[in-house]
Design a protein with these regions (language model features):
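N-terminal Skp1-binding subsegment of the F-box domain
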Residues: 1-28
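Leucine-rich repeat
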Residues: 1-3, 13, 37, 61-69, ...
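Short helix-loop-helix/strand-helix junction enriched in hydrophobic and basic residues
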Residues: 10, 24-43
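LRR N-terminal entry segment and analogous cap-like coil->beta motifs
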Residues: 39-66, 73-78
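Conserved hydrophobic beta-strand positions in leucine-rich repeat
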Residues: 50-54, 80-82, 108-110, 136-138, ...
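Conserved "Asn-ladder"/turn position within leucine-rich repeats
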Residues: 57, 85, 113, 141, ...
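Leucine-rich solenoid repeat scaffolds
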Residues: 276-283, 287-317
Length: 317
């Protein structure tokens, strides 16, 4: 008597699943038929899959659609890595559609996926309605200033996203202005990465204005931008009243001895900042001395990273 797939004993199907990877189970063994869905959902390993790493699988937009269909009924996955998959704006839309109602995913990595401002717009809807997602990585996409505005709109009233990575997205000073406006009302974000975005002194001013009164942001990454001594002065002024920022990364900017002096002045009285990164700027020995003198009286800043110009080594004070 021939054996039909739909009549295979459940235990035999379980044994077949034992030899499949998590990715195969999720992508290829869901939505085959209603009975098989029920069996997969009752399978022990499927019920305990909390992390899925699909980095560099080239799933693109169509693959993201299949994944989104799975996520509609999944109640276990908390961390999803889709880095380097070229999902684009279409893929971002598929994810956004399902994340509006998903109640388990807390961390989403979309690193290097060719997502533009349209895709960022789709993700804005997620930030407005999703109350579970705490970490979003959009590093090395193409959202630009317009996309940053969309993300900022979603952040206005978001109460759960704590970590946002927007490095290498060409958002510039205009994009920073939108994000700074959002930080005036957002009370959830604690970590913001804005490195490699072409941010200059004006962008530093926008951030400084909001940092004066912001009470939630603890980590701010501004590495590899175009911030000069004037921009650092704005940030230093903000640090005189800010009581929450603990880590500030200003490495690979255009900060010289004057900027180092501004930071040294505020380090004498700031009691919150514990880590300051000034690696690979234009700070010479005199600027380094200003910082060293300030730290003699500061018992709170425990890590200062600085490369003195024209020297090969870097020091941690």
């Amino acid at each position: 008597m021939p054996v039909s797939f739909v009549t295979l004993p459940v235990e035999l199907v379980y044994r077949i699943l034992d030899y499949q990877s998590d990715i195969t189970i999720i992508f290829s063994m869901r939505n085959v038929c209603q009975r098989f869905n029920a069996i997969v959902e009752s399978y022990d390993r499927y019920q305990t899959i909390t992390t899925l790493n699909l980095r560099w699988y080239e799933i693109r937009g169509i693959g993201t659609q299949h994944l989104a269909n799975v996520l509609r009924n999944n109640t276990t996955l908390t961390t999803l890595n889709l880095g380097l998959n070229k999902i684009g704006d279409v893929g971002a839309q598929h994810l956004a559609d399902v994340l509006r109602t998903n109640t388990t995913l807390t961390a989403l990595n979309l690193f290097y996926n060719q997502i533009g401002d349209v895709g960022a717009h789709h993700l804005t809807d997620v930030l407005r309605t999703n109350t579970i997602l705490t970490t979003l990585n959009l590093d090395r996409n193409e959202i630009g200033a317009a996309g940053a505005q969309h993300i900022a709109d979603g952040l206005q009233n978001n109460t759960t996203l704590a970590t946002l990575n927007l490095k290498r997205n060409q958002i510039g000073d205009v994009g920073v202005q939108h994000l700074a406006d959002a930080l005036r009302t957002n009370m959830a974000l604690t970590t913001l990465s804005l490195g490699w975005n072409g941010i200059g002194n004006i962008g530093a001013l926008y951030l400084a204005d909001v940092l004066r009164n912001n009470t939630t942001l603890t980590i701010l990454n501004l590495e590899r931008n175009r911030i000069e001594d004037v921009g650092v002065q704005h940030l230093a002024d903000a640090l005189r009243t800010n009581t929450t920022l603990m880590t500030l990364n200003l490495g690979l900017n255009v900060i010289g001895n004057v900027g180092a002096h501004h930071l040294a002045d505020v380090l004498r009285t700031n009691t919150t900042l514990t880590t300051l990164n000034l690696e690979n700027n234009h700070i010479e020995a005199v600027g380094g001395q200003h910082l060293a003198d300030a730290l003699r009286n500061n018992t709170h800043t425990t890590k200062l990273y600085i490369v003195v110009a024209h020297c090969l080594e870097w020091d941690v004070f």
